[in-house]
């Protein structure tokens, strides 16, 4: 297992878990982010957080529930999260056309592969709660770090 990085690009699931106290991984994600010297978010991950926070969801009985937050509340939560010491806004500055496709196996991997590509370009680890992203990682490049 790689050592804990001092700087990382956060996948949207780490942002969600860090912000929502009722998330099953909240404590681990929050602790990880607070332990970093710098944490990066992108337009893609910020938009993913806003989309998650403002969409209807289903409870354990599959009943439709209203969104967790209003649009304004979600934007305020994101603003609060990104106002923390150590936050760096990382532009999406790598074209999808420059990505290697060696490890990709399906259409659902585009975003994950892009975030790994962006992290590599900037010498960052990518923090995620999803171990499936490890399948896209290239051992010759900066390691994917998972919050578990």
State each model region's role.
Residues 47-50:
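Amphipathic alpha-helical repeat scaffolds of TPR domains
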Residues 2-3, 83-131:
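Active-site neighborhoods of divalent-metal-dependent phosphate/nucleic-acid chemistry enzymes
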Residues 54-57, 83:
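A basic- and aromatic-enriched beta-loop-alpha substructure that forms the phosphate/nucleotide-
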Residues 107, 141-148:
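Short, electropositive alpha-helical surface patch
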């Amino acid at each position: 297992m790689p050592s804990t990085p001092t700087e990382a690009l956060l996948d949207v699931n780490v942002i969600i878990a860090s912000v929502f106290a009722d998330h099953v991984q909240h404590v681990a994600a929050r602790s990880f982010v607070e332990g970093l010297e710098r944490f990066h978010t992108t337009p893609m991950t910020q938009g993913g957080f806003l989309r998650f926070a403002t969409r209807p969801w289903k409870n354990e009985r599959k009943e439709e529930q209203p969104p967790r937050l209003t649009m304004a509340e979600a934007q305020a939560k994101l603003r609060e999260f990104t106002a923390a010491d150590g936050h760096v806004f990382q532009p999406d500055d790598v074209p999808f056309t420059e990505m290697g496709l060696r490890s990709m196996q399906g259409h659902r991997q585009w975003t994950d592969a892009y975030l790994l590509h962006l992290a590599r370009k900037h010498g960052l680890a990518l923090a995620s709660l999803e171990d499936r992203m490890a399948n896209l990682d290239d051992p010759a490049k900066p390691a994917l770090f998972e919050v578990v």
